[in-house]
Curated annotation (Swiss-Prot):
GO terms for biological process: nitrate import; regulation of root development; response to jasmonic acid. Residues 1-30 form the signal peptide. The modification Hydroxyproline is found at residues 74, 79. It comes from Arabidopsis thaliana. Interacts with CEP receptors (e.g. CEPR1 and CEPR2). Extracellular signaling peptide that may regulate primary root growth rate and systemic nitrogen (N)-demand signaling. Keywords: Apoplast, Developmental protein, Hormone, Hydroxylation, Secreted, Signal. Residues 70-92 are annotated as: Disordered. Residues 31-70, 86-92 form a propeptide. This is Precursor of CEP12. Belongs to the C-terminally encoded plant signaling peptide (CEP) family. Coiled coil: none annotated. The mature small signaling peptide is generated by proteolytic processing of the longer precursor. One of its GO terms (cellular component) is apoplast.
Amino acid sequence: MVNRDNSIVALSFFMLFLLVLHLHFETTTAARKPVRVFGPPSSIEWSPPSPPKDDFEWFEINIYKNIEQTAFRPTGQGPSQGIGHKDPPGAP
């Protein structure tokens, strides 16, 4: 079994090794040329999009428009049935 003194010595050598390794790689990365993360700025000028045309080439008929308008009708048109009555219509 490993005693406490040996484990402390092994841990100390391991930490010393990590410190030397860290210092070595820190100096080698600092000696490298810096890497350009972003490229040079674009030379293309930005312009806003053109307004829509006045002619009807872009116009499309929405075939679903009538379906969308009448899609949800919970009751028939007009006043609600049974308002003002004690018993709603159809009650026994």
